[in-house]
UniProtKB/Swiss-Prot annotation:
Species assigned in the record: Methanospirillum hungatei JF-1 (strain ATCC 27890 / DSM 864 / NBRC 100397 / JF-1)
Active site per database record: H17
One of the GO biological process terms: 'de novo' pyrimidine nucleobase biosynthetic process
Similarity annotation: In the N-terminal section; belongs to the formaldehyde-activating enzyme family.
Gene3D superfamilies found in the cross-reference section: Aldolase class I, Formaldehyde-activating enzyme
UniProt xrefs under Pfam families: Fae (PF08714), OMPdecase (PF00215)
Region listing for 3-hexulose-6-phosphate synthase, in residue ranges: 162-393
Keyword annotations from UniProtKB, A to Z: Carbohydrate metabolism, Lyase, Multifunctional enzyme
Domain of life assignment: Archaea
Protein name: Bifunctional enzyme Fae/Hps
EC nos: 4.2.1.147, 4.1.2.43
The keyword Lyase is annotated on this UniProt entry: yes
Annotated PANTHER family: 3-KETO-L-GULONATE-6-PHOSPHATE DECARBOXYLASE SGBH-RELATED (PTHR35039:SF3)
Length: 393
């Protein structure tokens, strides 16, 4: 047996995070159990979980501090409410039948417990660690999460301790606001006016990046820390280097020009994958977008069918979106840019567009928030988890 469980419960400095492994005494878990009790280190001394002095919990459980214990107060918290909570949770799990028909004398548990240096409230420390241990045991035996749950949940919420969300584009359609602004004061004003919405993407436009460099991504993050930010660099050369620069600036996506050599595009896409950001090909002035996508050895995450600002008076030419997606193997988002206005949103969505790129219709509006909300309303998408009550994850 080798089962793994994890749970985080609580809030503030007293929150509890318990990682545990359940396994046979005569296997690798048993060996790790013995090593934990025999190979001690200052500030991380493991301790057997006892319900009270002289009453060992079963299955035998060793509590391992994750954080270095630096003073008497922390030691008292670990040997007091944390240890008692873990021991009681294990004992209650036995009583409630979580271990099934397993002989509790044949297995043992490694429980790694987090204790924040600023924690003070013994009552909360106990209750949070009890709940986290109990939930971690339950999850271990349920082998939680299953693949379906993992895929469904991985992009939905922010990590409770990290404090910010890293957005991913899994629930189209989206509105992408193109910031082709070259004044930082105006930029901050527009950003502050944009509504908070899971379906709103922010684009650092090419003029903005040329004026202020990629450091402008940090300016955007200062106002919109949870935003999905696209760096529209229109890469034409040194694809891997410029894609890495975009990733290092904390952009979520980087744009390359479809007019670049295929090798440059492929290097940029590969580098974007390595750094965990999205790759976007801008098809401005590309005669055969379908042919280009089909010819690439590695496919982008997004294709942008983009008409230049100087050509917006011409008729819509978004191409055959279905053929583009087919050429990419089906797993591709398509953005439409140039001349997008509220009355044509539905038309663009009907063609298969996943992202609508809008610039001056929002950024030059007298009421930026209202203009953005008009477009978002046309998407007819609820906020992700708007009606969900978050509990364990």
């Amino acid at each position: 047996m080798y089962l793994i469980g994890e749970a985080l419960i609580g809030e503030g400095s007293e929150l509890a995070h318990v990682d545990l492994i359940v396994g046979d005494k005569n296997g690798p878990v048993g060996m790790a159990f013995a090593n934990a009790l025999s190979q001690l280190s200052a500030g991380h001394t493991p301790l057997l979980a006892v319900v009270r002095p002289n009453l060992l919990t079963k299955p035998a459980t060793v509590v391992i501090p994750k954080v270095t214990l630096k003073n008497e107060g922390q030691v008292n918290q670990m040997f007091g409410p944390v240890q008692a909570a873990v021991a009681k949770a294990v004992a209650d799990a036995v009583e409630e039948g979580l271990f099934g028909d397993i002989n509790i004398n044949d297995i043992c548990i490694l429980a790694s417990a987090f204790l924040h240096p600023s924690a003070k409230d013994y009552n909360r420390i106990y209750r949070y660690n009890y709940g986290a241990t109990k939930l971690a045991i339950s999850r271990a035996f349920e082998e939680f999460p299953d693949e379906k749950t993992l895929i469904h949940e991985k992009d939905r919420a922010a990590h409770a301790v990290m404090g910010f969300k890293v957005p991913r584009l899994w629930d189209p359609p989206y509105l992408q606001v193109a910031l082709d602004i070259v004044d930082l004061g105006k930029l901050r004003s527009v950003l502050s006016s944009l509504p908070e919405n899971d379906h709103l993407i922010i684009e650092a436009g090419t003029p903005l990046i040329k004026k202020f460099g990629l450091n402008v991504i940090s300016e955007i993050r200062a106002v919109k820390p949870n935003a999905f930010i696209v760096a529209d660099m229109k890469i034409l050369d040194t694809g891997n280097l410029e894609a890495r620069m975009a990733a290092d600036s904390s952009a979520d996506a980087v744009v390359m020009s479809g007019l670049a050599p295929a090798s440059t595009i492929e290097k940029a896409i590969t580098e974007a994958r390595k750094t965990g950001i999205y790759s976007v090909i801008d098809m401005l002035n590309v005669e055969d977008p379908v042919g280009l996508i089909a010819s690439l050895k590695v496919k982008p995450d997004i294709v942008e069918l983009h008409r230049a600002i100087d050509a917006e008076h011409t008729s819509h030419a978004w191409g055959n979106i279905g053929d583009i997606k087919k050429a990419a193997g089906g797993k591709l988002l398509v953005a439409t840019a140039g001349g997008i206005r509220v009355p044509v949103v539905k038309e663009a969505l009907k063609t298969g567009a996943d992202i609508l790129v809008v610039g001056r219709a929002i950024t030059a509006s007298k009421d930026v928030r209202h203009a953005a909300e008009e477009f978002l309303e046309q998407l007819n998408k609820e906020e992700i988890d708007q009606f969900r009550i978050m509990t364990d994850f």
